[in-house]
């Protein structure tokens, strides 16, 4: 039987909820209020206490009722004979109800239900063996008003099932082009231990490359002449008889671009931090990328051979990013090493093996091969060449496979040592040829039994991608933010904050996190000081985030990446404006307004100081055009120093209205003379735009 609440029991037995609660407390039954649920055993205790007296009272009442019935029976006898059906209808149901109540057992509530699409209240009631009215009542308690034929959302279904301690699972119907549909689940007994896949990340000059080289040259499989003869973006080393696979990804951008395509190839991230330098901006960036991928982090404190090495300082700085050493009560492993002197390399490899053992990394080597693309290119002699990482199963020469939106048959395989191989197992990188097209890094691949099926699915996936590219890309933009919130598509708004100084970053991030509209929270996934970079844009694209710049500008690569990835870039000079814009967008209050459009950039190549005029910047227009009526800002090292108006724009000695790309000009900025060679002057106009 299902549990009932105290107020329901009290109502059924004409009792006060308070009396029931007081009695249960004397019996040491923990209840908080009239809404508390009680078990069958507790119900029996209550019956023994409260039902004895009512039954005696009922006997007296029944006797009086029976006497009255006998007196009236003779009077009603004629009516009963003349109208038998009517009386049967009246008495029948009451009699049946009294007889059937103890006999009829309610259907048991299932332990688990599954569904796909949506459910109406009536459908859910049928699955739970409950009355729709009972579910409608519970939905009302949850603040959801619904009729029995009305669809209810997934959250409401989960809450209702939670009330009955029923596990709920939503079935996802896969399309024929989804590779997940063809991946078979492996039985536990078929799984075997596999090597860990490790990515090394960190600041640009903290010794990532040196560490990779040290591991590569000291731990290459013994007996291989010439060591690594070919670099394929990944390699394996052996330590204590166990293999470890290292991915040589070119920076954090590639790491995240792979993740954005659904590839979760990394098992462990190694964060390299220089002992003499501490945590740097790219270190923080690497931490955020690794956390977003939800992989364990091992901190490698490098350059311990230097005089200024201070590992304690590194530990202290990393605690601010929730990486707390084991010695300080945390769960992050720290390894001190010197990559250039090959000191501590064995300790690092030992820790990697320890973490991989804890993570229980397993795969089925006998399954059809499945994995991800590490890198791919078009070679003049060999055609399409792709570096694959086998994540499950074994890949053989001659296997037909689908890779991303292309397909083919494995013609040849070369391992990380440059040797031709005929088969490779789980967690092994290999370079293959034989594909019809060039896949992208992060694409998934799967081996099929026959080439015809692989071709059919590969062509269908290619057509699907073409159709998707014609449509709009699913990204987050302030323009349609309110619409997404209204449709329930968003519960969290991801934001990346970049500013000119750390104080501004912290102030802006703190203010943005306080905004909450319609149950949508603001989540700051990355902050940093300095110009907006391409890496920021790729992280934003992978995480569906908006980038906010305060007193900083995007570099050329970042600007191009933002356009191609359709990432929303918002640049501000007043913190309040940034906060107001986000809050207004979330509330759906963005009215048509003016938006800045950058029309050109000029590089300052020479400075002329004239007493009556001020500083004249001899400039060369590198992009777009500079117009006389445009607003300008002076940028130095990616940071905006001044924003104002042009005082004069000249070509030789003549005043001009505009100067095009690849032409020189003289620029004077109103009320500003602190101009230096190498500065960038950016021209912009304000255009009226209408919010969609």
Curated annotation (Swiss-Prot):
Residues 248-251 are annotated as: G3. The keyword Cytoplasm applies. One of its GO terms (cellular component) is cytosol. Residues 302-305 are annotated as: G4. CDD domains: IF2_eIF5B (cd01887), IF2_mtIF2_II (cd03702), mtIF2_IVc (cd03692). Residues 227-231 are annotated as: G2. Pfam families: EF-G_D2, GTP_EFTU, IF-2, IF2_N. Residues 85-94 have a biased composition (Basic residues). Residues 59-84 have a biased composition (Low complexity). It is found in: Cytoplasm. GO terms for molecular function: GTP binding; GTPase activity; translation initiation factor activity. GTP binds at residues 202-209, 248-252, 302-305. PROSITE patterns: G_TR_2, IF2. Residues 202-209 are annotated as: G1. Residues 51-114 are annotated as: Disordered. Residues 338-340 are annotated as: G5. Residues 193-362 form the tr-type G domain. InterPro entries: EF-G-like_DII, IF2_II, IF2_N, P-loop_NTPase, Small_GTP-bd, T_Tr_GTP-bd_dom, TF_IF2_bacterial-like, TIF_IF2. Keywords: Cytoplasm, GTP-binding, Initiation factor, Nucleotide-binding, Protein biosynthesis. Belongs to the TRAFAC class translation factor GTPase superfamily. Classic translation factor GTPase family. IF-2 subfamily. One of the essential components for the initiation of protein synthesis. Protects formylmethionyl-tRNA from spontaneous hydrolysis and promotes its binding to the 30S ribosomal subunits. Also involved in the hydrolysis of GTP during the formation of the 70S ribosomal complex. PANTHER family: TR-TYPE G DOMAIN-CONTAINING PROTEIN, TRANSLATION INITIATION FACTOR IF-2-RELATED. This is Translation initiation factor IF-2. The gene is infB.
């Amino acid at each position: 039987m299902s549990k009932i609440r105290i107020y329901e029991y009290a109502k059924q037995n004409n009792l006060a909820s308070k009396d029931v609660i007081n009695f249960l407390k004397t019996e040491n039954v923990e209840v908080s209020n009239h809404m508390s649920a009680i078990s069958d055993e507790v119900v029996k205790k209550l019956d023994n206490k409260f039902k004895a007296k009512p039954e005696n009272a009922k006997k007296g009442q029944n006797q009086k009722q029976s006497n009255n019935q006998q007196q009236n029976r003779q009077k009603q006898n004629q009516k009963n004979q003349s109208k038998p059906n009517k009386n049967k209808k009246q008495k029948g149901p009451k009699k049946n109800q009294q007889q059937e109540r103890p006999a009829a057992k309610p259907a048991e509530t299932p332990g688990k239900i599954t569904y796909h699409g949506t459910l109406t209240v009536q459908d859910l009631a049928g699955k739970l063996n409950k009355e729709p009215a009972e579910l409608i009542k519970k939905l009302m308690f949850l603040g959801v008003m619904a009729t029995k034929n009305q669809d209810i959302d997934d959250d409401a279904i989960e809450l209702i099932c939670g009330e009955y301690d029923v596990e709920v699972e939503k079935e996802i119907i896969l399309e024929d082009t989804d590779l997940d549909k063809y991946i078979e689940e492996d039985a536990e007994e078929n799984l075997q231990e596999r090597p860990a896949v490790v990515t090394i990340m960190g600041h640009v000059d903290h010794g990532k490359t040196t560490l990779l080289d040290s591991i590569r040259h000291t731990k290459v499989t013994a007996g291989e002449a010439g060591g690594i003869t070919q670099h394929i973006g990944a390699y394996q080393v052996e330590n204590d008889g166990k293999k470890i696979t290292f991915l040589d990804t070119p920076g954090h951008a590639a790491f995240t671009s792979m993740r954005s395509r659904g590839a979760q190839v990394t098992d462990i991230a190694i964060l390299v931090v220089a002992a003499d330098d501490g945590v740097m901006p790219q270190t923080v960036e690497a931490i955020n990328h690794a956390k977003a991928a939800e992989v364990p982090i091992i901190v490698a404190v490098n350059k311990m051979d230097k005089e200024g090495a201070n590992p304690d300082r590194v530990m202290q700085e990393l605690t601010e990013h929730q990486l707390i050493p084991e010695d300080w009560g945390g769960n992050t492993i720290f390894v001190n090493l010197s990559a250039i002197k090959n000191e501590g390399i064995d300790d690092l490899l030992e820790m990697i093996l320890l973490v991989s053992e804890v993570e229980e990394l397993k795969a089925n080597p006998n399954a059809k091969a499945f994995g991800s693309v590490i890198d791919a290119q078009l070679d003049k002699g060999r055609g399409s060449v792709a570096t694959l990482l086998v994540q499950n199963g074994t890949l053989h020469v001659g296997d037909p496979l689908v890779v991303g939106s292309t397909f083919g048959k494995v013609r040849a395989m070369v391992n990380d040592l440059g040797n031709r191989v005929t088969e490779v197992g789980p967690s092994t990188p290999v370079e293959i040829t034989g594909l019809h097209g060039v896949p992208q890094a992060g694409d998934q691949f799967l081996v099929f039994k026959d080439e015809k099926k692989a071709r059919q699915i590969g062509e269908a996936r290619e057509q699907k991608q073409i159709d998707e590219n014609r449509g709009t890309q699913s990204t987050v933009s302030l323009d349609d933010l309110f619409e997404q919130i209204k449709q329930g598509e968003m519960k969290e708004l991801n934001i990346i904050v970049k500013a000119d100084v750390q104080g501004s970053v912290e102030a802006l991030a703190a203010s943005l996190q306080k905004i909450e509209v319609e149950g949508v929270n603001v989540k700051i996934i990355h902050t940093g000081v300095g110009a907006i970079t391409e890496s920021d844009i790729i992280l934003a694209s992978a995480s569906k985030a908006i980038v906010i710049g305060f007193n900083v500008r995007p570099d050329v690569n970042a600007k191009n990446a933002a356009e191609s990835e359709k990432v929303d870039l918002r640049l501000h000079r007043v913190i309040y404006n940034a906060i107001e814009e986000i809050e207004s967008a979330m509330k759906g209050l963005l009215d048509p307004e003016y938006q800045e459009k950058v029309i050109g950039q000029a590089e300052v190549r020479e400075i002329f100081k004239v007493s009556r005029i001020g500083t004249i910047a001899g400039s060369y227009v590198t992009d777009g055009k500079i117009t006389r009526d445009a607003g300008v800002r002076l940028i130095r090292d990616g940071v905006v120093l001044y924003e104002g108006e042009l005082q004069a724009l000249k070509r030789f000695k003549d005043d001009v209205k505009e100067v095009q790309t690849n032409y020189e000009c003289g620029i004077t900025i109103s009320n500003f003379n602190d101009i230096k060679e190498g500065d960038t002057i950016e021209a912009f106009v304000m255009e009226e735009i209408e919010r969609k």
